Swiss-Prot record:
Name assigned to this protein: Uncharacterized leucine-rich repeat-containing protein AMV014/Q3
Keyword Nucleotide-binding: no
Domain of life: Viruses
Segments annotated as LRR repeats: 18-39, 43-59, 60-81, 82-103, 104-125, 126-147, 148-168, 169-190, 198-219
The keyword Repeat belongs to this UniProt entry's keyword annotation: yes
Segments forming a coiled coil: none
Keywords linked to the UniProt accession: Leucine-rich repeat, Repeat
InterPro entries the record matches: LRR_dom_sf
Length: 486
């Protein structure tokens, strides 16, 4: 039976009729006569540019993704009266500033669209989230509807922040990488703001933080020198994440009354005794450059602590709550010898990073059998790794940032790991033996190591650098091993 073209179109319409989402690319181009009749279609991603497709988008569409297509004429959007989500980012030559967008839009992404006139936004009375980052500086007075809850203005080089004071419903604000001199320190930000990112933006001081009593997350960057005593961080009761790594710790850290869950502290090689009072809600803690072994006493009070990371610091013993799951020591030292026996009590420990200048009693202690992941960045620990023998649940083994002139032998053939990773060990030579259980090898290393790639029967994936590409493609040409070049 011969079918007419109209019959074929009808069959295809019935085939696609109930689809809610379609992605159009070079390999999946839909007939425009079918597309415009898909009345149930809600979400459309167009990755392949075709003007006929744009002019036949169903008017009932709710979400449209047309990023980086070099579209010039966006007039077709005005017909989409039900659209709530619109992504037109990276269309640098479009006429977006000259059209009236549908009032229904709640999410608009026009990042990197070469915009300098933003008045078209004022019409969007239902707008909740707006991304206009990486565009040109313009006049923002009376541009943004007060409905906006999230606003991303990264890298626009804002000079006058006065417009933000009117956004009374604003909760999340990203003004990072605005390096031009501006008046932010004179602005009274809306109290509604809970998340503020001003990373690497120009600021004369932090006076603008005073009004942000509801802030939940904040990170101090290194654009200006600031002392902790200059900022009363204790008044931010709703804080959940705080990064003060770029603050000079010249006063006590008193935050026990907050809702803090994560904090990063840099002691800047100080040997001062600091009173640290953190809430029991804390789950993640990072301490850097602490040269005073007495500044860890507060850890025992943190009964919900799950993760601790200690970097370039002095520590002799770790006394924390027994429920801790992740412990990472990176480039750490001790005034005498770190007592590894203190790790035996952490029966829920999942991940352990061992970066110490000595191994003292590591091979004599009995590490928790709960450990599934080990990360090592000390050559002496690699050479004497008997402590691994009792880790029956170990699945992941990583060698990180080891530099040595000798050839290092690593025998893991009897340790039933599934994932092995070596990274940042430039100019170091290894002789590595892995078990048959190995499934993933990450070889982010610029030297060819002595490793028998062929014998691992369970191997599924290798991630490596370009220098190993030809060798591995040849070895695994007719196998199911996936090779990813990074």
């Amino acid at each position: 039976m011969d079918l007419l073209n109209s019959d074929i179109i009808l069959i295809n319409i019935l085939k696609y009729y109930n689809l809610k989402k379609i992605i159009i690319n070079r390999d999946n181009v839909i007939n425009i006569n079918i597309l415009k009749k898909l009345v149930n279609l809600e979400e459309l991603h167009i990755i392949y540019y075709d003007n006929n497709i744009l002019n036949n988008i169903p008017e009932n569409i709710k979400s449209l993704y047309i990023s980086n297509l070099n579209i010039i004429n966006l007039n077709f959007i005005t017909k989409l009266k039900n659209i709530t989500y619109l992504d037109i980012s990276y269309n640098k030559n479009s006429n977006i500033s000259n059209i009236i967008l549908p009032h229904s839009i709640e999410f608009l992404n026009c990042e990197s669209c070469n915009i300098n006139d933003y008045n078209f936004i004022n019409n969007l009375v239902n707008l909740k989230k707006l991304i206009i980052s990486k565009n040109k500086f313009g006049n923002f007075n009376n541009v943004f509807p007060i409905s906006i809850v999230e606003l991303n203005m990264e890298s626009i080089q804002i000079k006058d922040y006065k417009f933000i004071e009117k956004l009374i419903n604003l909760k999340k604000l990203d003004i990072s990488f605005n390096v031009k001199k501006n008046n932010i320190h004179l602005i009274k930000f809306p109290k509604s703001i809970t998340h503020l990112c001003d990373y690497q933006s120009y600021k004369e001081n932090y006076n603008y933080l005073k009004n942000l009593s509801n802030i939940i997350e904040y990170e101090f960057d290194d654009t200006i020198d600031v002392k902790l005593s200059d900022i009363d961080i204790s008044k931010y009761y709703n804080l959940q994440y705080l990064d003060i790594q770029n603050c000079e710790i010249n006063t006590d850290i008193l935050l026990c009354h907050t809702k803090l869950k994560k904090i990063k502290i840099n002691f800047n090689n100080s040997k001062k005794n600091i009173i640290i009072d953190l809430p029991i809600s804390l789950e993640c803690l990072k301490i850097s450059n602490n040269f005073n072994i007495n500044n860890y006493y507060f850890l025992t009070q943190l009964i919900r602590l799950k993760k601790i990371k200690i970097v370039n610091s002095y520590i002799n013993i770790l006394n924390a709550c027994k429920s801790i799951e992740i412990i990472k020591f990176i480039s750490c030292k001790s005034t005498y010898n770190f007592n590894f026996n203190c790790l035996e009590k952490y029966k829920k420990l999942d991940t352990l990073s061992l970066g110490f200048n000595n191994i003292y009693n590591l091979n004599e202690c009995i590490l928790p059998i709960s450990i599934r992941q080990i990360i090592i960045n000390n050559v002496e620990i690699i050479k004497k790794s008997n402590f691994l023998n009792n880790l029956y649940n170990l699945e992941y083994f990583e060698i990180n940032s080891i530099i040595c002139n000798d050839i290092i032998t690593i025998n893991l053939s009897k340790i039933k790991i599934k994932h092995f990773k070596i990274i940042y060990c430039n100019d170091t030579l290894f002789n590595i033996m892995l078990p048959d259980t190995i499934e993933i090898i990450e070889y982010i290393h610029d030297k060819n190591i002595n490793l028998d790639w062929k014998k691992y029967k369970n191997l599924k994936k290798i991630k490596t650098l370009n220098n190993m590409k030809d060798i591995l493609y040849k070895i695994y040409k007719n196998t199911n091993v996936e090779i990813e070049i990074i």
